[in-house]
Regions:
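Juxtamembrane transmembrane-helix boundary signature
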Residues: 44-76, 83-89, 383-387
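Membrane-water interface regions at transmembrane-helix termini and the short interhelical loops
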Residues: 29-33, 59, 98, 102-110, ...
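Extracellular loop-to-transmembrane helix junctions
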Residues: 29-58, 80-82, 215, 370, ...
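C-terminal membrane-solvent junction of multi-pass transporters and transport-like membrane proteins
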Residues: 171, 323-389
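Hydrophobic transmembrane alpha-helices that form the core helical bundles
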Residues: 80-113, 260-276, 319
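Membrane-interface "cap" regions at the ends of multi-pass membrane proteins
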Residues: 1-38, 136, 175-180, 192, ...
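Membrane-interface loop-to-helix entry segments
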Residues: 117-159, 170-171, 208-215, 310-322, ...
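Transmembrane alpha-helical segments of multi-pass small-molecule transport proteins
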Residues: 14-18, 84-89, 110-132, 145-156, ...
Length: 389
């Protein structure tokens, strides 16, 4: 029996679902102090950088038909890749909890029955999504995405056409570089996941391009909704925006379905990454466990400001993908037969430290691009020096 492959349409739908998210709208609100013009420029520049990296990561996995964490072995070796598989599972558990928390908080603002109840509802729906499975979600996703698309159009209309409010004045509390970095961070957080989906595609390179473009456009749109809401309605609480818009139950559906379709990807990929750590584990079962942990964490811990979490993701995964790009596209080498590729691990550590240092420097293009350029340069030089020795 031939393996079922995903179409370009299905890949586009998956990444549309990833982009429509409460977390992205909330992150967009952080950019309001820049004002609309500068904020929009930062969103677009950040997403261009982030989605280009997303594309490269997806192409690597798609071409070799390997999951995201399996492709990491090509640069860091069998055991060396375990560090990133572990860090990836950790960030995905974090994202699962944050997404459920944000969704439940917003849902409770529309229909107040208690945040923990909404955490449970969203958690159960995510488990249902995992059980149905990615290749069987085609029709379910089409219905969910169509509804989300219409409802987010309504939300955009309410914010930009019906608010009637004068935009708030820009201030200096957010620099342009920091705004770019917050815009890079979202696509970058998907970077260790994209190959989990492109490896299943009939046409991996085309599917990767469509995935990166669809996600980039939708994510920009979510950021703009959040930023616009904060600027034009003076409201940072997404539930309040929806209530003021008269989007009671419809708004509730946006919140729940967008949370489920995005968080499903986090939990599913945590399961796939866990298989790289312990071969005997079943990815689907781990995904369900991750959802349960995320649901409990969302009930117990407050997770209102995620900027530090986003910067941490950037500092871990920007140098990682820089090394992968250098190895796959420039040096054309594969370390997957090795136990540990020590040189690349040292280069990654340098890249991680450089990113953390760049956080204290205000650069117009953010930290990710300079950090990746430095990491790739160090990687290529280290490779040449190693050969000469």
């Amino acid at each position: 029996m031939s393996e079922k492959r995903t179409s370009l349409w299905e890949n586009g739908l998956i990444w549309f679902g990833a982009g429509v998210s409460i977390a992205e709208i909330l992150t967009g609100t952080y950019l309001a102090p820049l004002g609309f013009g500068k904020g929009l420029a930062a969103i677009i520049l950040g997403h261009l950088i982030g989605c280009l990296m997303l594309f490269f990561a997806g192409v690597i996995g798609g071409k070799v038909r390997k999951s995201a964490m399996e492709t990491v072995k090509m640069s860091f070796g069998q055991k060396g890749s375990l560090l990133f598989a572990f860090l990836n599972v950790l960030q995905l558990v974090g994202w699962t909890a944050i997404m459920i928390y944000d969704g439940a908080l917003a849902a409770d603002g529309v229909l107040s029955v208690g945040r923990w109840v909404w955490c449970l509802v969203i958690g159960v729906l995510i488990v249902l999504w995992i059980v149905i499975g990615i290749t069987n979600l085609g029709k379910v996703n089409v219905i969910a995405m169509s509804a989300l698309f219409v409802l987010t159009l309504i939300l955009s209309k309410v914010i930009f056409l019906d608010s009637g409010a004068v935009g708030m004045a820009a201030d200096e509390s957010m620099t342009f570089g920091a705004a770019v970095e917050l815009s890079v961070a979202m696509p970058l957080s998907w970077l260790p996941l994209i190959s989990d989906y492109t490896r299943e595609a009939k046409e991996p390179v085309k599917a990767t391009a469509i995935s990166a473009v669809v996600y980039g456009v939708v994510s920009c749109w979510m950021y703009v909704i959040g930023m616009g809401a904060a600027i034009y309605t003076g409201e940072y609480d997404i539930a309040q925006i929806m209530l003021k818009s008269g989007l009671g139950i419809a708004g509730l559906l946006i919140i729940i379905f967008s949370t489920v379709t995005t968080t499903f990807l986090d939990a599913y990929s945590a399961g796939i990454s866990s298989e790289s750590i312990v071969r005997k584990w079943n990815g689907k079962h781990v995904a369900i466990v991750v959802t349960v942990i995320g649901t409990v964490a969302a009930m117990v811990y407050p997770m209102d400001n995620i900027t530090d979490f986003l910067y941490l993701i950037g500092s871990v995964f920007a140098p990682m993908i820089a090394i992968q790009i250098a190895d796959f596209f420039l040096l054309k080498r594969d370390a997957s037969s090795q136990n540990v590729q020590l040189t690349n691990l040292i280069v990654w550590l340098i890249g991680f430290l450089v990113y953390r240092m760049l956080m204290h420097v205000d650069m117009p293009v953010g930290n990710t691009l300079p950090d990746m350029a430095i990491t790739m340069l160090v990687c290529v030089v280290a490779s040449k020096v190693g050969k000469e020795r």
